[in-house]
Amino acid sequence: MKINAFTTVSRRSFLAYCGGTAVAAAITMPSVMARGDVAPFRAGIACVDITPELPVSMVGGFRDRTATGVHDPLHARCIVLDNGEAQLALVMVDNCLIQRPVFEAAKKRIQEKTGLSPDRVLAAATHTHTGVTVTSVFQSDPVPGYADFLAERIAEAVDTAVKALEPAQIAWGSGAVPGEVFNRRWYMKDGTIPPNPFGATTDKVQMNPPRASENLVEPSGPTDPTVSILALRRPDGTPLAVLANYSLHYVGDTEAAVLSADYYGFFADKLASLMAPAASGKPFLAMMSNGTSGNINNVNFGEAGVAGPPYSRMSAVAESVANEVFQRYQQLEFQDTAVLASAMREITLGVRKPAGEDLERARAIVAAAEGPDMKTSEEVFARESILLADFPDAVPVPLQALRIGELGIAAIPCEVFVEIGLALRNESPFKNTFTIELANGYNGYLPTAEHHALGGYETWRARSSYLEVAAAEKIQETMQALLAQVKS
């Protein structure tokens, strides 16, 4: 079958591309009930193909890349919950970065189709670096027509779930996979960190340093090995859906010029295969959300690496995480219903814009570049400085919190540093809490103020990192308030 994202995927193709299991179930607005009646808890699932026609731009590098093949299809996966009084939808999209207007367009269509208001829909990118460009970052620009198509497909995923509701039971919990997450920002021996693209030698840490280098000192922060789990099953015990959350940036051992959902899609397929015997042929959906992984990846820099064939690391990570989720699933205590609540708040944050000598230097570098493509990191970030100079002085940032029973979910539209996710969990009013990053928009990296002082790639001023230094503190404070709001 030729994968064509601009046509409707048939049911047979849908089964083939979603782990071999039909995926659809739903939610409706609560109906009027007689006194004393209790509406059954219901959950719905859907999986929609978002793979584009080729060739197409792939975001995720300093230079644009063109995809000419597809290793595995891209999807928008959806879970919808209904307790008879409130409804929530969670959508995970196989993409690197999705700008807010795309999500807003999708949510507008969702409300028109289903009645679900925007605050009751959490939609996020997974952060695969082999997805389609829908947000301008570095030298990649949005693929014409794909943003509108993607918004429609996200809405279709929710609408499909809304139209196939079935009774369900719900549970939540967590496990741990410590062996697949590593902090990628390292302290190095004095004098061994290269100058940054702005010509300064002030960075105190280096992202992705040489592996097993004698110049390594120690990682600049922790990791979060937690795998959080939201699970749904039917009253007869057959599994219906699992949403997992893991703080791992992406894996990325793909072939060149090939689209892939990365380990997020591999995880969905692996868990579906593990669940298949228990599912007994009934629909089941697995999906992975990205936690707080702005400074985390899958590389153990303390050891020399051994290169494997393409996709081998993705497969290994997916298998490790899926096996842990599968084992923990067996221990979950399911219940017949759960409180559902949501809250959204928009805050305004300042932009770190270049000016004066910094901007003059950037213009001189770009003018001297052989172009039109910028080839060196100095040229790339000079171009970013020029583009960032046209940004407003402040930007709105949407924040969201969900309550699902005694589980709290924070949603932030940034590549969030792991310290922030750990703090939100520790300070949450819920026993179980996790954060989904890159949700409802894209506002670049979110380092803590302490990490801003250390410098390094994630702090370098660009369209990928532009929020004010105090942004993390302000976002964390607002998220704590939102979690408290949905808890009450």
Predicted regions: what is each one?
Residues M1-V9, Y17-I27:
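N-terminal secretory signal peptides
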Residues M29-S31:
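N-terminal signal peptide c-region/cleavage motif recognized by signal peptidases
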Residues D37-A124, T128-L285, S289-A316, Y329, ...:
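Conserved beta-alpha junction segments in alpha/beta enzyme cores
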